[in-house]
């Protein structure tokens, strides 16, 4: 009976799977730490931005000599809080990107585990 697989690669598969699994676990651990930090930063920048936004909005309304429309108020507040809004968007994007990287690493880990399980069930 002819073997359909490369015997040399087949012999090294358990070690490759173990190395792949350990590598992905390390990556996931790093990403979890990074995601926690990104989550905290995103929460702080969001809270800061929203608090400043509310404060500025009240100040604009209180200091208005004539009644302003809501779009005019929002435009004035937005122009004063550009930096804070940008910091909030960047922090939010970092959190999203880190979360996606974590999901990708978890998928790779699942693939390595599936490969190892397939090898074991095939009698390897």
Q: Which residues fall in each region the model found?
A:
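Short, charge-rich amphipathic alpha-helices with coiled-coil/heptad character
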Residues: 1-34
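Charged/polar, solvent-exposed surface patches and flexible loops
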Residues: 19, 23, 30, 47, ...
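Short, glycine/alanine-rich amphipathic alpha-helical segment
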Residues: 63-93
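Short acidic DE-rich linear segments
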Residues: 2-3, 121-124
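Extended alpha-helical coiled-coil "stalk/arm" regions
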Residues: 38, 42-73
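Long amphipathic alpha-helical coiled-coil segments
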Residues: 39-42, 46, 86-119
